[in-house]
Amino acid sequence: MQPKIPWPNNKQFAFTIFDDTDRANLKDNQLVYQCLNELNFKTTKSVWMTDGNKPTKDSGVTCDDKIYLNWLLELKNKGFEIGYHNTTYHSSYRQEIKEGLEKFVKIFNHSPAVMANHSANQENIYWGSHRVSGSRRAIYNILTRFKKNKFYKGHNESSPYFWGDLCRKHITYVRNFVFSDINTLKCCPFMPYRDLTKPYVNYWFASSEGNNVKMFNKCVSDKNQDRLEEEGGACIMYTHFADGFCQNGELSEKFKKQMKRLSKKNGWFVPVSTLLDFLKKEIKAQEINPKQRRALEWKWLFDKLILGST
Protein backbone atom coordinates (compact mmCIF):
# COMPACT_ATOMS: atom_id res chain seq x y z
CA MET A 1 0.00 0.00 0.00
CA GLN A 2 1.26 3.46 -0.93
CA PRO A 3 1.93 5.63 2.16
CA LYS A 4 -0.30 8.68 2.50
CA ILE A 5 1.12 12.00 1.41
CA PRO A 6 1.37 14.71 4.11
CA TRP A 7 -0.54 17.37 2.18
CA PRO A 8 0.12 21.08 2.88
CA ASN A 9 -1.89 22.88 5.55
CA ASN A 10 -3.03 19.58 7.06
CA LYS A 11 -5.26 18.86 4.07
CA GLN A 12 -6.46 15.28 3.70
CA PHE A 13 -6.29 14.90 -0.08
CA ALA A 14 -5.68 16.86 -3.28
CA PHE A 15 -7.98 17.58 -6.21
CA THR A 16 -7.55 19.55 -9.40
CA ILE A 17 -8.72 19.66 -13.01
CA PHE A 18 -7.06 19.96 -16.41
CA ASP A 19 -9.60 21.46 -18.79
CA ASP A 20 -8.94 20.49 -22.41
CA THR A 21 -9.96 23.48 -24.55
CA ASP A 22 -11.54 21.50 -27.41
CA ARG A 23 -14.78 23.12 -28.65
CA ALA A 24 -14.62 25.81 -25.95
CA ASN A 25 -16.57 29.06 -26.12
CA LEU A 26 -16.34 32.06 -23.83
CA LYS A 27 -19.91 32.13 -22.52
CA ASP A 28 -19.94 28.54 -21.29
CA ASN A 29 -16.39 28.79 -19.95
CA GLN A 30 -17.40 31.78 -17.86
CA LEU A 31 -20.24 29.82 -16.24
CA VAL A 32 -17.99 26.89 -15.34
CA TYR A 33 -15.14 28.95 -13.96
CA GLN A 34 -17.40 31.28 -12.00
CA CYS A 35 -18.70 28.20 -10.21
CA LEU A 36 -15.21 26.82 -9.58
CA ASN A 37 -13.96 30.16 -8.30
CA GLU A 38 -16.91 30.61 -5.94
CA LEU A 39 -16.19 27.16 -4.49
CA ASN A 40 -12.46 27.98 -4.14
CA PHE A 41 -11.20 25.44 -6.66
CA LYS A 42 -8.10 26.66 -8.50
CA THR A 43 -7.58 24.52 -11.56
CA THR A 44 -5.87 24.50 -14.97
CA LYS A 45 -7.45 25.87 -18.16
CA SER A 46 -5.65 24.92 -21.37
CA VAL A 47 -5.53 27.17 -24.43
CA TRP A 48 -4.78 27.32 -28.12
CA MET A 49 -2.57 30.23 -29.04
CA THR A 50 -3.83 31.05 -32.54
CA ASP A 51 -6.80 30.58 -34.82
CA GLY A 52 -6.21 27.76 -37.26
CA ASN A 53 -6.68 28.07 -41.00
CA LYS A 54 -8.44 24.71 -41.29
CA PRO A 55 -11.59 24.55 -39.13
CA THR A 56 -12.20 21.13 -37.54
CA LYS A 57 -14.89 19.49 -35.42
CA ASP A 58 -12.82 20.41 -32.35
CA SER A 59 -12.38 24.09 -33.27
CA GLY A 60 -12.93 26.51 -30.45
CA VAL A 61 -12.01 29.96 -29.23
CA THR A 62 -8.28 30.82 -29.12
CA CYS A 63 -6.00 33.51 -27.72
CA ASP A 64 -6.49 35.48 -30.95
CA ASP A 65 -9.89 36.50 -29.57
CA LYS A 66 -9.20 39.63 -27.51
CA ILE A 67 -12.29 39.35 -25.29
CA TYR A 68 -11.49 35.72 -24.50
CA LEU A 69 -7.84 36.58 -23.88
CA ASN A 70 -8.77 39.32 -21.42
CA TRP A 71 -10.95 36.81 -19.59
CA LEU A 72 -8.04 34.33 -19.47
CA LEU A 73 -5.82 36.99 -17.91
CA GLU A 74 -8.51 37.71 -15.32
CA LEU A 75 -8.73 33.99 -14.62
CA LYS A 76 -4.97 33.80 -14.15
CA ASN A 77 -5.08 36.74 -11.73
CA LYS A 78 -7.65 34.83 -9.65
CA GLY A 79 -5.20 31.96 -9.19
CA PHE A 80 -6.12 29.65 -12.03
CA GLU A 81 -3.39 28.18 -14.22
CA ILE A 82 -3.18 28.56 -17.98
CA GLY A 83 -1.93 25.41 -19.67
CA TYR A 84 -0.96 24.54 -23.23
CA HIS A 85 -2.86 22.39 -25.75
CA ASN A 86 -0.65 22.80 -28.82
CA THR A 87 -0.47 25.90 -31.00
CA THR A 88 -3.92 25.47 -32.52
CA TYR A 89 -6.57 22.85 -33.25
CA HIS A 90 -4.80 21.33 -36.25
CA SER A 91 -1.24 20.24 -36.98
CA SER A 92 1.49 22.89 -36.85
CA TYR A 93 5.02 22.88 -38.21
CA ARG A 94 8.08 23.60 -36.09
CA GLN A 95 8.25 27.35 -36.79
CA GLU A 96 4.54 27.76 -36.02
CA ILE A 97 5.02 25.85 -32.77
CA LYS A 98 7.99 28.02 -31.85
CA GLU A 99 5.98 31.17 -32.51
CA GLY A 100 3.05 29.79 -30.49
CA LEU A 101 5.26 29.11 -27.47
CA GLU A 102 6.85 32.55 -27.75
CA LYS A 103 3.38 34.09 -27.90
CA PHE A 104 2.38 32.20 -24.75
CA VAL A 105 5.43 33.57 -22.92
CA LYS A 106 4.73 37.11 -24.14
CA ILE A 107 1.09 37.02 -23.04
CA PHE A 108 1.34 35.12 -19.75
CA ASN A 109 4.91 36.09 -18.75
CA HIS A 110 6.13 32.51 -18.40
CA SER A 111 6.38 29.28 -20.34
CA PRO A 112 3.47 26.84 -20.02
CA ALA A 113 4.28 24.59 -17.08
CA VAL A 114 1.80 21.93 -18.11
CA MET A 115 0.37 20.65 -21.38
CA ALA A 116 -1.69 17.93 -23.00
CA ASN A 117 -1.41 16.83 -26.62
CA HIS A 118 -4.37 17.54 -28.92
CA SER A 119 -5.30 14.21 -30.50
CA ALA A 120 -5.70 15.58 -34.04
CA ASN A 121 -2.22 17.10 -34.27
CA GLN A 122 0.73 15.40 -35.94
CA GLU A 123 3.23 17.35 -33.82
CA ASN A 124 2.07 15.53 -30.69
CA ILE A 125 5.07 14.31 -28.77
CA TYR A 126 5.44 10.58 -28.00
CA TRP A 127 1.77 10.06 -28.83
CA GLY A 128 -0.30 7.33 -30.41
CA SER A 129 1.59 4.03 -30.45
CA HIS A 130 4.65 5.83 -29.05
CA ARG A 131 2.88 6.12 -25.68
CA VAL A 132 3.49 2.43 -25.02
CA SER A 133 6.25 -0.11 -25.57
CA GLY A 134 6.84 -3.79 -26.27
CA SER A 135 3.80 -6.01 -26.67
CA ARG A 136 1.58 -3.17 -25.41
CA ARG A 137 2.38 -1.24 -28.60
CA ALA A 138 1.24 -4.14 -30.76
CA ILE A 139 -2.00 -4.39 -28.77
CA TYR A 140 -2.53 -0.63 -28.99
CA ASN A 141 -2.10 -0.72 -32.77
CA ILE A 142 -4.64 -3.52 -33.06
CA LEU A 143 -7.11 -1.63 -30.86
CA THR A 144 -6.68 1.51 -32.98
CA ARG A 145 -6.48 -0.40 -36.28
CA PHE A 146 -2.99 1.00 -36.85
CA LYS A 147 -4.46 4.47 -37.52
CA LYS A 148 -2.06 6.11 -35.05
CA ASN A 149 1.00 3.95 -35.54
CA LYS A 150 3.14 6.52 -37.36
CA PHE A 151 0.89 9.58 -37.33
CA TYR A 152 2.52 11.54 -34.49
CA LYS A 153 5.97 12.99 -35.13
CA GLY A 154 6.74 15.69 -32.57
CA HIS A 155 9.69 13.69 -31.23
CA ASN A 156 11.03 12.71 -34.67
CA GLU A 157 14.04 14.89 -35.43
CA SER A 158 13.74 14.32 -39.18
CA SER A 159 10.11 15.48 -39.30
CA PRO A 160 8.90 19.04 -40.08
CA TYR A 161 6.66 18.56 -37.03
CA PHE A 162 9.63 18.05 -34.69
CA TRP A 163 9.68 20.27 -31.60
CA GLY A 164 11.10 17.95 -28.95
CA ASP A 165 13.87 20.36 -27.97
CA LEU A 166 11.32 23.18 -27.61
CA CYS A 167 9.11 20.98 -25.45
CA ARG A 168 12.02 20.18 -23.18
CA LYS A 169 12.96 23.87 -22.99
CA HIS A 170 9.51 25.28 -22.29
CA ILE A 171 7.25 22.67 -20.72
CA THR A 172 7.72 20.95 -17.38
CA TYR A 173 4.84 18.46 -17.30
CA VAL A 174 3.11 16.55 -20.11
CA ARG A 175 -0.03 14.46 -19.62
CA ASN A 176 0.01 10.84 -20.70
CA PHE A 177 -2.17 8.07 -19.27
CA VAL A 178 -5.78 8.51 -18.14
CA PHE A 179 -7.50 6.14 -15.71
CA SER A 180 -11.07 5.52 -14.55
CA ASP A 181 -10.12 5.72 -10.85
CA ILE A 182 -10.65 9.06 -9.10
CA ASN A 183 -7.38 8.58 -7.21
CA THR A 184 -4.87 9.38 -9.95
CA LEU A 185 -1.96 9.04 -7.56
CA LYS A 186 -3.04 5.52 -6.67
CA CYS A 187 -2.86 4.58 -10.36
CA CYS A 188 0.47 6.34 -10.88
CA PRO A 189 2.14 6.62 -7.44
CA PHE A 190 5.45 7.86 -8.85
CA MET A 191 4.16 10.86 -10.79
CA PRO A 192 5.52 13.17 -11.93
CA TYR A 193 8.13 10.90 -13.45
CA ARG A 194 10.87 10.91 -16.07
CA ASP A 195 11.04 8.27 -18.78
CA LEU A 196 14.51 7.80 -20.27
CA THR A 197 12.95 6.31 -23.40
CA LYS A 198 11.23 9.67 -24.00
CA PRO A 199 13.99 12.25 -23.44
CA TYR A 200 12.20 15.28 -24.90
CA VAL A 201 9.66 15.34 -22.06
CA ASN A 202 10.87 16.58 -18.68
CA TYR A 203 8.14 14.95 -16.57
CA TRP A 204 5.00 12.96 -17.27
CA PHE A 205 1.79 12.91 -15.25
CA ALA A 206 -1.39 10.85 -15.33
CA SER A 207 -5.00 11.89 -14.84
CA SER A 208 -8.48 10.61 -14.06
CA GLU A 209 -11.17 10.28 -16.71
CA GLY A 210 -13.81 13.00 -16.80
CA ASN A 211 -14.00 13.44 -20.57
CA ASN A 212 -17.50 14.93 -20.59
CA VAL A 213 -20.08 15.98 -18.03
CA LYS A 214 -21.50 12.48 -17.63
CA MET A 215 -18.09 10.86 -17.09
CA PHE A 216 -16.92 13.72 -14.86
CA ASN A 217 -19.94 13.48 -12.57
CA LYS A 218 -19.58 9.70 -12.43
CA CYS A 219 -15.94 9.97 -11.40
CA VAL A 220 -16.67 12.54 -8.68
CA SER A 221 -19.65 10.63 -7.27
CA ASP A 222 -20.26 10.85 -3.53
CA LYS A 223 -18.77 7.40 -3.04
CA ASN A 224 -15.64 8.22 -5.01
CA GLN A 225 -15.16 11.56 -3.26
CA ASP A 226 -15.32 9.84 0.10
CA ARG A 227 -12.84 7.18 -1.00
CA LEU A 228 -10.39 9.79 -2.33
CA GLU A 229 -10.57 11.49 1.06
CA GLU A 230 -10.14 8.24 2.99
CA GLU A 231 -7.16 7.18 0.87
CA GLY A 232 -5.50 10.57 1.22
CA GLY A 233 -4.99 10.53 -2.52
CA ALA A 234 -4.73 13.03 -5.35
CA CYS A 235 -7.01 13.47 -8.33
CA ILE A 236 -6.12 15.27 -11.55
CA MET A 237 -9.38 15.21 -13.48
CA TYR A 238 -9.03 15.47 -17.25
CA THR A 239 -12.10 16.94 -18.88
CA HIS A 240 -13.60 19.03 -21.66
CA PHE A 241 -15.77 21.67 -20.03
CA ALA A 242 -17.25 22.29 -23.49
CA ASP A 243 -18.81 18.82 -23.55
CA GLY A 244 -22.22 18.96 -21.91
CA PHE A 245 -21.43 20.98 -18.79
CA CYS A 246 -23.57 23.86 -20.06
CA GLN A 247 -26.89 23.53 -21.86
CA ASN A 248 -28.91 26.53 -23.06
CA GLY A 249 -26.88 28.90 -20.92
CA GLU A 250 -27.28 26.85 -17.74
CA LEU A 251 -24.55 24.99 -15.86
CA SER A 252 -25.22 21.33 -15.04
CA GLU A 253 -27.01 21.07 -11.69
CA LYS A 254 -25.42 17.69 -11.04
CA PHE A 255 -21.96 19.16 -11.63
CA LYS A 256 -22.67 22.06 -9.27
CA LYS A 257 -24.00 19.69 -6.62
CA GLN A 258 -21.00 17.36 -6.79
CA MET A 259 -18.45 20.17 -6.76
CA LYS A 260 -20.18 21.92 -3.87
CA ARG A 261 -20.06 18.70 -1.86
CA LEU A 262 -16.39 18.20 -2.69
CA SER A 263 -15.54 21.80 -1.79
CA LYS A 264 -16.73 21.23 1.79
CA LYS A 265 -14.15 18.52 2.35
CA ASN A 266 -10.66 19.22 3.67
CA GLY A 267 -8.99 19.05 0.27
CA TRP A 268 -6.06 20.87 -1.29
CA PHE A 269 -7.55 22.51 -4.40
CA VAL A 270 -4.66 23.89 -6.44
CA PRO A 271 -3.71 24.01 -10.15
CA VAL A 272 -2.12 21.00 -11.82
CA SER A 273 1.48 22.24 -11.86
CA THR A 274 1.27 23.36 -8.21
CA LEU A 275 0.20 19.84 -7.25
CA LEU A 276 2.90 18.25 -9.41
CA ASP A 277 5.60 20.58 -8.07
CA PHE A 278 4.70 19.46 -4.57
CA LEU A 279 4.66 15.78 -5.49
CA LYS A 280 7.98 16.12 -7.27
CA LYS A 281 9.59 17.22 -4.02
CA GLU A 282 7.60 14.95 -1.72
CA ILE A 283 8.03 11.76 -3.72
CA LYS A 284 11.47 12.81 -4.97
CA ALA A 285 10.52 12.50 -8.64
CA GLN A 286 12.25 9.59 -10.23
CA GLU A 287 13.02 7.92 -13.51
CA ILE A 288 10.44 5.25 -14.21
CA ASN A 289 11.94 1.78 -14.45
CA PRO A 290 10.94 -0.92 -16.98
CA LYS A 291 8.79 -2.80 -14.46
CA GLN A 292 6.88 0.34 -13.50
CA ARG A 293 6.46 1.30 -17.15
CA ARG A 294 5.05 -2.11 -18.05
CA ALA A 295 2.57 -2.05 -15.16
CA LEU A 296 1.42 1.47 -16.02
CA GLU A 297 1.00 0.65 -19.71
CA TRP A 298 -0.97 -2.55 -18.99
CA LYS A 299 -3.27 -0.73 -16.57
CA TRP A 300 -3.93 2.01 -19.11
CA LEU A 301 -4.63 -0.45 -21.92
CA PHE A 302 -7.09 -2.30 -19.69
CA ASP A 303 -8.87 0.96 -18.90
CA LYS A 304 -8.80 1.91 -22.58
CA LEU A 305 -10.74 -1.24 -23.46
CA ILE A 306 -13.47 -0.02 -21.10
CA LEU A 307 -13.32 3.75 -21.60
CA GLY A 308 -12.36 4.05 -25.25
CA SER A 309 -10.24 7.05 -26.22
CA THR A 310 -8.05 8.28 -23.35
Region annotations inferred by a language model:
Residues 1-201, 214-238, 244-310:
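Catalytic alpha-helical scaffold of carbohydrate-active enzymes acting on polysaccharides/glycoconjugates
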Residues 209-212:
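Propeptides and adjacent flexible N-terminal/non-core segments of secreted
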